[in-house]
UniProtKB/Swiss-Prot annotation:
GO biological process: translation
Top-level taxonomic group: Bacteria
One Gene Ontology term, aspect cellular component: cytosolic large ribosomal subunit
Family recorded in the similarity comment: Belongs to the bacterial ribosomal protein bL33 family.
Pfam family, one: Ribosomal_L33
Name of the encoding gene: rpmG
Swiss-Prot/TrEMBL keywords: Ribonucleoprotein, Ribosomal protein
Protein name from the UniProt record: Large ribosomal subunit protein bL33
GO molecular function, one term: structural constituent of ribosome
Keyword Hydrolase set for record: no
Species whose genome carries this gene: Nitrobacter hamburgensis (strain DSM 10229 / NCIMB 13809 / X14)
């Protein structure tokens, strides 16, 4: 079997609320860490979410 191109990553809120999203990322084209601005329902505003490893 071939190695999977897409991997699942955890996007953790930079507001330190403990909230996170799970996203897919193409490991061949996106070699750097993913950063997205998304809504954090705990903080009730849009904040940056940074990539972390799923344990």
């Amino acid at each position: 079997m071939a190695k999977a191109v897409t991997i699942k990553v955890k996007l953790v809120s930079s507001a330190d609320t403990g909230f996170y999203y799970v996203a897919k990322k193409n490991s061949r084209t996106m070699t750097d860490k993913m950063v997205k601005k998304k809504y954090d329902p705990v903080a009730r505003k849009h904040v940056e979410f940074r990539e972390a490893k799923i344990k």
